[in-house]
């Protein structure tokens, strides 16, 4: 196991195209870090630079106490798990698990012990003599994970390992990866475009956009306090509602609706306001609220996603399945549940609720 330090790392391609811009990440020993973002955000490129499969244009990567910029991939003490399994089709499961260890001239008794341990952990014991073609997709991915585990590396690198699996199998494999990582305590970097996968696996998320870090933090911190409109729209399902609005004194204007903020206005003028679907409720008689026109409803069993409009802007709200929804209704949200972003930069504007939280934390530690 080892800490990994990524310092001011950049990646340039021919023609002056910069794919990764000055990335800094300090990964603690035993931590599970997930790099998440849309296609083309640089997450796989960054992982490949850590692995040594891509050259680093600027900056340094340190694994343990070694700077590994010029170190061959085989000598970096890492193990990778890929989307396409990368198994040898002519070898049995046992032979696939043994292969890397044999190449490193590991003693046979040690190979046998490591293979037996990995097979037991991954429930592969009944399949050790089978060829990959006789296995399901989930079983093949477990073999790929087993091949990484037997190496006992300083770090695991996962490059979208579940992308080829169906939805049900992805859920079970997510749990298996999380359980194994906690059991082994091995530092791990995991790449995915699936924000649900990222939220459920990570100790910390690194949200990437255009080759730059948008935010680093624990999953719930990123969810509840997104640093930008990009993060707000990418993390969470459904995505956070982002509406054009204007702050007038202590009131929020969204189209024709005016909403009192009770001292929570962080600034004045035009802003982008963010609202999570689950934070809305029906407004009581006489209570201030937004006029909401229903367009259509998605029934998900555990909740209803109601899509509609406030003025001329789209909005999605989430209600329990037993709530009756008329075609037009008045909805409300607590002032402290609102998120404010600059309408120019998209960056978060700290509201009074966050400022009060910081002050309370400072007083508690004083």
Curated annotation (Swiss-Prot):
Under Enzyme Commission nomenclature, its number is: 7.6.2.10
Q: Where is the ABC transporter domain?
A: 4-235
Coiled coil ranges (UniProt) are none
- UniProt keyword annotations, A-Z: ATP-binding, Cell inner membrane, Cell membrane, Membrane, Nucleotide-binding, Sugar transport, Translocase, Transport
Q: A single GO CC term, please?
A: ATP-binding cassette (ABC) transporter complex, substrate-binding subunit-containing
Its localization reads: Cell inner membrane
Q: What Pfam families does its record include?
A: ABC_tran
- Could you tell me the superkingdom of the organism this chain comes from? Bacteria
SUPFAM superfamilies the record matches? MOP-like, P-loop containing nucleoside triphosphate hydrolases
The record's catalysed reaction(s) read: sn-glycerol 3-phosphate(out) + ATP + H2O = sn-glycerol 3-phosphate(in) + ADP + phosphate + H(+)
Q: Is Cell inner membrane given among the entry's keywords?
A: yes
Checking NCBIfam families in the record gives: PRK11650.1 (NF008653)
What name does UniProt use for this protein?
sn-glycerol-3-phosphate import ATP-binding protein UgpC 1
This protein's species is: Agrobacterium fabrum (strain C58 / ATCC 33970) (Agrobacterium tumefaciens (strain C58))
Which taxonomic lineage is given here?
A: Bacteria, Pseudomonadati, Pseudomonadota, Alphaproteobacteria, Hyphomicrobiales
The gene behind this protein is ugpC1
